Amino acid sequence: MSITYTTVGELKVGSYVVIDGEPCRVVEVTKAKTGKHGSAKANVVAIGVFSGAKKTLMAPVDQQVEVPIIEKHIGQIIADMGDKIQVMDLETYETFEIEKPTEDELASKIRPNAELEYWEIMGRRKIVRVK
């Protein structure tokens, strides 16, 4: 599993964080200073990269959190097999199957021999863009 660590206080909108074992993109960060003897708290709202579910994280700003390492690759579509697509990586020439995207904009562009950009996050793959 490819992850690194950072503090909650360093998270910004648009960055990525692991919440409940799922990589998520941060959409909102609010920080609140508590009383005399408490530490500052941060409320992080994020959306799951794979599930699309909204997740929240409430923690002290100095707490360590996991940040996924995103590997970006270029591939070529070999075959459309219904709910999955067979893709060949253009750097390593490895072939594998990947879930077909549910977004209509991406699904309409899928055809054999088209190039695509996919991300590999924590051992899972997701199609981001079809060229």
UniProtKB/Swiss-Prot annotation:
Hypusine: residues carrying this PTM: 36
Signal peptide: none
GO BP annotations listed: positive regulation of translational elongation; positive regulation of translational termination
GO CC annotation: cytoplasm
Entry's localization field: Cytoplasm
PROSITE patterns: IF5A_HYPUSINE (PS00302)
Gene Ontology MF, one: translation initiation factor activity
Role summary: Functions by promoting the formation of the first peptide bond.
Family from the record: Belongs to the eIF-5A family.
UniProt xrefs under PANTHER family: TRANSLATION INITIATION FACTOR 5A FAMILY MEMBER
HAMAP family: eIF_5A
Identification of the protein by name: Translation initiation factor 5A
Gene: eIF5A
